[in-house]
């Protein structure tokens, strides 16, 4: 996770949440906005660990394929969606990072 955020130059990063998220082949995540809460304070990073050319992500009016092994910051407060038109499931490793996480947010949820 630290390698994925190196360019942010955090002094004291905290990683309160990490998960694997699967989007099955042929499935869609409809356009939505994640709730505010701590999302206003965190950077949400997606790293595709299994993907295919038909796995697409839409945010800010832009549709793109997120390449295997690359790290992408996603603004999940803005409207976003995803679709997987490929034959293989898409799996992303997703984690949150704060600079000096607020008290009570230092636990890791996996």
For each feature predicted by the language model, list its residue ranges.
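A short hydrophobic beta-strand segment most commonly corresponding to one strand
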Residues: 42-48, 71-73, 87-105
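Short beta-strand His + acidic residue motifs that chelate non-heme Fe in jelly-roll/DSBH
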Residues: 31-32, 55-57, 74-75, 79-87
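Signature of the catalytic double-stranded beta-helix
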Residues: 1-20
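A short beta-strand-loop-beta hairpin characteristic of the jelly-roll/cupin
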Residues: 48-68
